[in-house]
Every structure is written in C-alpha cells, then in structure tokens.
C-alpha cells in the first residue's frame, strides 16, 4: 500500500515527494495520484498504458500511422528481412540465449518471431532513430545485433522481473496485439 508507506516515510523525509514509473509502474504512479492526490508533490508516469481490452487493438492502427510512410516501410522491410534470414540467424540467436541462461515457455523459434513482431512497437516506444535501422543488405550479424538491441528475447524469459505484470495483463489489464498480416 503506497499510501501507508508514504505516510510512514514522511515522518523521516518531510521534503517534497515524487512518484514515477514506466509501464505498470506508470499506471501505479497515475492511479496513486488519483486515489491519494495529496501524498506526493509530483507524479511522472513515463508510460502508463490503460488498455481497453485483453487485446487492446489501438496499437496496431497507431503503428500504421506513426512516423512517415518511409519510416514505416523501413521498419517493415527490416522485419521481413530478419524473418527471411531466420534459418541463418536462429543459431546465433540460440547461442546468445544459451549464454545468458534464458529459458522460455515457448519454443525458441516462436520467441524469435515474437522479437520480430515486438520490434515495430519497441522502436517507437524507446525513441530509436529510424536512421539506425540497418539496410536489408547488411550482414547477418548487423541485422541480428540491431534486432536484439531493440527487441531482444529477455522480454519473454521465464524468470522475467516483469512476469507478474504479464500475468496481470493477460487476466485483467490487457495488452497490445501484433499485426501479423504483413508477415504471412
């Protein structure tokens, strides 16, 4: 209970208070302000997604409009290229996952696909410069390194520190879906 914690600590730290967070933490910061508006002086929810359904559906249209047409094409071309090269890239992907002791609840091939699907959202969410996307003619290593830097598999590991959020998202809060049409 953030209210009880804040109340207790204000006796030790009587200065200004801030609440902040990203994703679920952003939701918490936002809702904390709603229910206890006088507990903190400033609320900074960096990302506070409030989904309308288990699979929200608003993200896919947003991804079809954000940036320029050339930006969106560059993103999709990159995704298509790493899918085309999956057979060549998967061994290095698997090696990296093994070295990091990653374990998953789905086959590694599906985790790779999820990384590719997550890419279009992640690149915008983290403010990555679209010019940093490698050309489709780039080497296998260059393409895989870029994919891993933007939407790596740690997002999907079994012992993820965000696992409880994903369970809550699946059961209560909702989450965004993936538009798979361009990749069929």
Question: Predicted regions span which residues?
Answer:
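Structural recognition of the beta-strand scaffold that forms the well-ordered cores
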Residues: 18-20, 42-45, 169-171
